[in-house]
């Protein structure tokens, strides 16, 4: 009930993100072989319950160790009731969508295209590259064209849009700000992992194309999210600039020495590096 209440509140909130914190108990209801509580014990995290601990735990939770996967009658009843509720909700939403589609055929066709997962159509001949320009400047030229031609694209940067040159995209749109979501650029602040999570979440929802930029060395902060995105094969775009071993006055803290090897070794992540 508390989870449902939190989700309902989150869905009603239209102006700001909602953080739901679920406090759990490790090994809830588990008992050791001697019958003492196994709750909140570190061992339950990495090892399965076995022997008498397994038997005691199943009994403690109201089940039969000889037939542990039986679904309780009250659970069956709860799920059956919820299934009927969901059928009604789905029918109402499908009817509402059908009415909307009938009244908005052009928008409906556009929505279908955006949610199809197909690559957007881009006229790359519109990209103008200057000879000898830095790779991040070349990226900015491409992003500017994408901002103009891909209306469902969102680009983000971790407080570095003027340096990683994702501002090539920003200059053709405006930032998303509180109370105004009409822009297509998300200024994430110094929060690389959060930025990655949000862009990946957008891609999982569907309907948008998400890309984000920061210095290559800061890919370290994003690594857990990048790895999961790669394993899940989510086509989100990571733009990492300043990828040379020497990055001038910023010094060793900003020099990506080992990051390239880490990223190239990551399974299912496609790497494209423009270098001479």
Please report, for each region that a protein language model flagged, where it lies by residue:
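Thiamine diphosphate
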Residues: 76-276
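Glycine-rich ThDP/TPP pyrophosphate-binding loop and its adjacent helix/strand module
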Residues: 1-81, 251, 259, 265-276
């Amino acid at each position: 009930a508390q989870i449902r209440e939190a989700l309902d509140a989150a869905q009603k909130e239209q102006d700001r993100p909602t953080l739901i914190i679920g406090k759990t108990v490790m090994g809830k209801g588990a008992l050791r072989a001697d019958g003492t509580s196994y709750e909140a014990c570190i061992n339950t995290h990495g090892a399965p319950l076995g022997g008498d601990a397994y038997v005691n735990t199943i009994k403690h939770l109201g089940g039969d160790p000889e037939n542990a996967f039986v679904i309780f009658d009250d659970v069956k009843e709860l799920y059956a009731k919820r299934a009927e509720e969901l059928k009604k909700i789905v029918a109402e939403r499908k009817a509402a969508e059908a009415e909307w589609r009938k009244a908005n055929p052009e928008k409906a066709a556009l929505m279908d295209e955006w949610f199809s997962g197909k690559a957007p159509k881009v006229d790359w001949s519109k990209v103008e590259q200057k000879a000898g320009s830095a790779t991040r400047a070349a990226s900015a030229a491409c992003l500017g064209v994408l901002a103009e031609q891909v209306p469902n694209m969102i680009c983000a940067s971790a407080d570095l849009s003027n340096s990683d040159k994702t501002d090539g995209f920003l200059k053709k749109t405006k930032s998303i700000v509180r109370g105004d979501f009409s822009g297509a650029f998300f200024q994430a602040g110094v929060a690389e992992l959060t930025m990655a999570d949000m862009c990946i979440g957008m891609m999982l929802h569907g309907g948008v194309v998400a890309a984000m930029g920061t210095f290559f060395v800061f890919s370290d902060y994003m690594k857990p999210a990048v790895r999961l995105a790669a394993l899940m094969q989510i086509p989100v775009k990571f733009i990492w600039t300043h990828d040379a071993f020497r990055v001038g006055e910023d010094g060793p803290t900003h020099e990506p020495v080992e990051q390239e090897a880490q990223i190239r070794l990551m399974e299912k992540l496609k790497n494209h590096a423009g270098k001479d």
